[in-house]
Amino acid sequence: MLMYFQDSFARLMTIHHVAAFDIVKQHRMWVITEVQMDIRPTVTYWSEDFTVEIWVSELTSLRIYCDFRIVRKDNEQLIASGTSQWNILNLDTKRLETTDFLADKLTVVPELMTASHKKVRFPKPQSFDMLMEHRATRLDLDFNFHVSNRSYVTIALLTIPDEVLASQTLASVIVHWLHETYLDETLTCHMSHIDDGSYLHTLTNAEGIVVCELMSRWQQQPEIPEVSEVLNRDL
């Protein structure tokens, strides 16, 4: 779902001529720093059509907030919704730039805000329930040769216990991306089971610097149809 949202974000920015390949000519780069997503307990199939609705809900001097909904195309049943935070990075100075040049290009729709834009503060656990190391490979990289933001999510969720995966499905996820990492770097993921039933995943680099924080919450899996029911669908 994160992939579909990011692809839709790229398409929206392309329409407004401020996509990654547009602003790189001005030595600028899009950087996603946070995403919050709520996921409904529903079963989707590979052959189903769905729609991603996306819009800018707030534009501040340094941040762009983009909200989204993913719905089934046939009945508009909600599959997932959320919000994201983006910044513009100057490639020469490695500092954040203002969003002034976007003001006349993007339409802001604040009344459709799907979630609060107030920064979520993660708890600081005193102990960890699991520790896992991961060495970044080429499969983890994006087109900028950094570890992809989606790779951090994949690595973090590998620390979820098997018994949870066997009976539950993801209900919500909050991700903070803090620092870049690269090929062959070793990432350490510390997982803690929080009192409210959520799981906190903290990824650090070899220097112990936190590069990504993720909070996942899980819910009971919906009833899954028999294989025969799936095969008999009118596709």
What positions do the PLM features span?
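Acidic/His-leaning functional-site neighborhoods
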Residues: 132-217
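Small beta-barrel nucleic-acid-binding modules, principally OB-folds
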Residues: 28-42, 168-180
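HotDog/MaoC-like acyl-thioester-processing domains
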Residues: 36-38, 44-122, 181-183, 192-235
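Hot-dog-fold acyl-thioester-processing enzymes
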Residues: 1-32, 81-83, 90-171, 223-235
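Intrinsically disordered, low-complexity segments enriched in polar/charged residues with Gly/Pro
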Residues: 29-30, 55-58, 74-76, 125-127, ...
